Amino acid sequence: MKYLLKTQLPLLLLIGMVINGQQSQEGHLLLSQLEIENTDQPWWPATKNKAITNAPIKIAGNPYKHGIGTLSGSRLFFFLDGRSSDFKCHVGIQDKQDPAENVQFNVLSDGSKLFYTQQQGEKTFVGIANTKNNIGKGSVRFIIKGDGKTLWKSKKITGGQKPQPVKIDLSGIQVLELSVEDNGDGISGDHAIWAQPTVTYTSFKPQLVDANYLNKLKTVDKNFTNKIKPLVQELPMGQGEYVQGTKADWLVNDINLPSKVYQQANGKEIVISNGLVSRTFRLTPNCATVGFTNLTTAETLLRGVGPEATITLDGDEYVVGGLDGQIEYGYMKEEWLEQMWSPPNSFQLSNFTVGTIKKRINWPNKRWSSQPKGPIKGKHIGFDYTHPKYPDLAVTVHYEIYDGIPLISKWITLKNNGQKAVVLNSFKSEILAMVEAESAVEKQKGWETPNIHVESDYAFHSMSMKNANKVVHWEKDPRYTSQASYLLSTPCLLECKLPIGPNKTLDANGTFQSFRVWEMPFDSHDKQRKALYTNAMYAKIAPWVTENPLFLHLTTTDDDKVKAAIDQCAETGYEMVILSFGSGLNMEDLSKSNIEKFKALADYAHSKGIELGGYSLLSSRWISEEVDVINPETGKRGGVIHGSSPCLNSQWGIDYFEKLRTFFSKTGFDLLEHDGSYPGQLCASTSHIGHKGLEDSQWKSWKRITDFYKWCNENGISLNIPDWYYLSGSTKNGIGYREVNWSLPRERQLVLGRQNMYDGTYDRLPSMSWTFVPLTEYHGGGAAATIEPLDTHLGAYKAHMIQNYGMGLQACYRGPRLYDTEKTKATVIEVVAWYKKYRDILNSPIIHLKRANGREIDGIMHINPALQEKGLALFFNPTNKTLTQTINLPLYYTGHSKKVQISEKDKEKVEYELARDYLVELEVQIPPNDSTWFVIY
């Protein structure tokens, strides 16, 4: 059955009803076309276009093709939405039939019998009486009500009486009720007929609803009128740049426009906007996103309405908010919203709150970074939802919009305020019917997706965002039947959902917070401009990634050598020593001697103004059968990502993180270099203490490791992790290189290193990555590959430092020392001093000018219109001859539009006029295998 009123539809169904057809603008509806047979009435279901006895409809000899066959005691309810004009029908009692053959019966509580026949499993009603031969002729009264008030009531109607015509005005009626009452002489023979029951409607097609629907409407209307609407009215009206968008380019100009939540003139919608992006929510008959606009281009991103989220509880899926009834999913018109209803069985909006953005992670910002201390500015709005089946479960959908950047964040939370446990099997925290990026008729090998950046903090098992982004999916939208694709395969439905689980049990007072997603529409397809968007996003939502301490990768834990390295760092301007892999550091050793050893070294480093960090390996380890991840395919350990790995939710895994917390707390270490971080593997074990089984293993593991990373971040512990954990507190990731390349000859390392940095600084800030310099042998290569002795290979050593620091990256200078002679020391001091002088601009986003190819000048340019140094361009000559070239330097993103001053290597400034395309012609001459740099003021 599609619709069974006897099962009590969830309260707050609202205007939702299960239908198959689409709305019509105007027409006449025979109510018998609806799912009448699935309604609830005493003794036997109503019948469509037949009498209750399944015979053709006939009243006093008058046949009718259409009608509803019922019994006395029946009540039928139809939602009209106040947009029907009249109701017409004929009423009467079905003519008596000859006694049926092979009649069976059930005895009723009053001693009478319900007679029926049965053929091939199908039962047919005959009547109610003491015997099958004395079924009465029937005697009833028909009643028509509108919104609970009687509109018409018949006199006594008996069997054999001619049909009575009825015509009722329905103007303004929300719910129409058709009922039949017994006339006091019993139900026998009360085979009532609503013949040709026709409603004339405009714009909204009547729908079958349940008996409590009117009360539901009143409840919803009351909640909107008494609670939601007053909250809306407290908000300001939208105007100016919040509605039309700001005209300035936010990548060049500081947008001093605080985010705002405002109301629409219709009183039913509210908008979050910062002048760059906006999202519109309609709050009645349920809450739904009905607008998503890129205000920088005035582009509408949304083509359809859907739920705000879906959640599967105890095995059943429920929609959260949303609207149904859109007649076309290729586009959306505002007037259609008035004709839409809340989805059946949905969580209903009960309240909303507006506030400011709260920090996700309380980053202490204790070392150098390009981001100032202070709060992240913007607005937060939370929409609260309830459901009658889960009266103690609070569901909230959260949004944040950030000042000065076209960026919105979203996540959901659940709280169980009752005593009965609830299982959250799965969820979708975002569902958006977006305008497609391309319209292709045939099957595509690769589809272009909408031009919007969507990223989540639920990320792992990759050093790039594209591969680490595990929850963002562009799906087909089967509702979009008018799309160009014959197979309806256009990926234009954004869904954010877990690969599996979380299968989270919410006990009494239990809570759940989903992953977050961030959504940022681009205004261009230009790769460089889109890169500047994401650079700005990371600085805004994960400001800790702008930390960029200068560090030495030390390969020993010998006290004297560590102290000597610390001394060298202090003398040259370096800021941190990292006890690297292979150094002998074991953070899992909490013995008194181990803690005392490394606390003493940390104390010594701090006394010199140097920080101390170290390496720990998590994944790609074989621990034991009881501890390791169980492969779901084999039921045994092994054969998973990294070969074998400990399950983070085994007792060993839980103890591992506690050991690291203890080590850092007792030693005062400042950085964790965490190798083999959690790669998202599933664990099929049912004996690990921290998870129930396969379905919750990934979520629990991700939660455990990201909770640890957040703890580190909040305690001032910097995090170097070769994985995409930035949004969970990590500060650095590898730039993306092939490790064996560091065993190649030095001159090849330099060119390949610049290629790696050039490619790896599009989607992220320079400070977000590390690169590598093998001071000592690494993966082979011998003397031709290493920098040691440093003085002997000082040219290569300096070249590495210039290109790394010049591009804003720290490198893992892996070896026992920073210098071996006074000459080497002076060179290190010179480069570090240069870096620190221009540190702000060198840590700013990069404009990619020319990728290194080993044959000609290559280079990049940092830009930051907020600084005194608006840009710094760095060029390299990889050849054995002097190269001279006129370079068109693009200065648009420096903020200059007319004139600019440029200085080469701190020489006298030269003034240039910008061309109409913001270019200046710069004459560049570079000696063989050397570099030069220019500062733009």
State where each predicted segment sits.
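Gly-Asp-aromatic-enriched flexible segments
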Residues: 23-216
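Acidic-aromatic substrate-binding/catalytic surfaces of carbohydrate-active enzymes
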Residues: 219-243, 267-369
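Active-site-proximal substrate-binding groove within the catalytic cores of carbohydrate-active enzymes
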Residues: 270-275, 279, 286, 292, ...
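Active-site groove signature of glycoside hydrolases
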Residues: 575-582, 657-690
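C-terminal beta-strand-rich structural cap/linker in extracellular carbohydrate-active enzymes
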Residues: 913-937
